[in-house]
Amino acid sequence: MYLRRKIDAFLEEWKASNDRKPLIIKGPRQVGKTESILHFARSHYPHILYINFVEEPKFKQILSDGYSEENILRNISILSPEAALIPHETLLVFDEIQEFPDIATSLKFFKLKGNYDVILSGSMLGLNYRRIESNSVGYKEDFEMTSMDFEEFLWAKGYGESLTTDMLSHMQSLTPFSQLEMDQYGALFLDYCLLGGMPEVVKTYIEQGHFSQILPKQRQLLLDYEEDIRKYLPGLEQTKVLSIFRSIPAQLAKENKKFQITKVARGARLSRYMDAIEWLNDAGMVNLCYCLNFPELPLKGNGDRSRFKIYFKDTGLLIASLDEEAQEDLRANQNLGVYKGALYENMIAEALFKAGLPLFYYKKENSSLEEDFFIRSQHELIPLEVKAGNGAAASLRQLIKNPNYGDIHRGIKLVRGNIGCRENIYTFPYFCAFLLKRYIKGLAM
């Protein structure tokens, strides 16, 4: 069972380009990179050469005579004589390149020759990407893949583009959803929250129709991520990174979700842990959301690098990291308890990141003024508040009405309720979060 992904359309466009460059697909482990590449390859190429540098490390020898296309193909033929290497017919796929980043140097020569399409893929690439970038600059194209977003989950459940179009139309016209729509889409979104977006987890749920086999898969994924930390880091750094990674659920369960290093180790200093935090971010395991120095445009350069929140890149990791009682309560009773705010906030951060939006929040010193996220349109800054209930939005009103915040004219509130608008505060259900970038783009037109 293949689950349709957004990378499918990108690969179609890449193949149709007359000036296509070798492609590097990066992203966290188990988000479906290899499956999507091979699904595309089987329907577009008569022959595929697939090399996995983890499963077959012997292929690291293919560069022993240099980086030219001729030498690489000759060495591949020596190691794999049955390989069909036919110009303009064979797709070359090099997987797990984090184990062999030197292969990226060959992309220049493959591009200049133009005989073969080449796709490279790997996880943990942030750790080696400066090296990969310097070795292939100007001769490759990049695509960053994430786990499934809510739209892809809806595709997996059998819905098509017409649903997305209808949802966006409701948002643009501020037309409330019917009760049937609210119940159905809300239930789907809650299922997605509990599952996360890892394809193998979603596939199991789609095939079985229940959650009974989901938790073991989520826990294994969490263990795999921790194993990567142990694999790629020496002892002391490994301990720091694991300590931070394991502290995220407790950090998010706090009323103030700002990352506090003292929750990781008593008496610890943030400066000693920043490399470990950046490692997790580069490895694609977490999203960092920086506090704005002041809520104004431009956003770039306006973030305080010493004040931030850490979210799991995929909310399924947050679910898997909770204690067993909390997990059972979540699935059996849909009781979000103390983690209600954490779950929804992590999910919205994930949705914004997957839509290509940067993550920023704001907390005014010595004040109750605080906003969860910000989105910029062409000419304005729009604060975004995630409400666990459907309560008041005092901070939103203050930001909109106070002339000191001149870039802010309206705000958005995400709630469990329906669509509405009052005092320039636009209210949308949580399940609309994946459409916010498209909605904001429409406001600017």
Predicted regions mapped to residue ranges:
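Hydrophobic positions on the alpha1 helix immediately C-terminal to the Walker A/P-loop
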Residues: 36, 40
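Interdomain motor-coupling "hinge/lid" segment immediately C-terminal to the ATP-binding subdomain
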Residues: 130-253
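Conserved lysine of the Walker
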Residues: 33
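Short glycine-rich substrate-engagement loop in P-loop NTPases that contacts/grips substrate
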Residues: 55-88
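Structural recognition of the conserved hydrophobic beta-strand(s) that form the central parallel beta-sheet
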Residues: 93, 117-123, 144
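Accessory nucleic acid-recognition modules appended to NTPase machines
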Residues: 203-370, 374-378
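Catalytic cores of nucleic-acid endonucleases
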Residues: 388-428
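N-terminal pre-Walker A segment at the start of P-loop NTPase domains
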Residues: 1-16
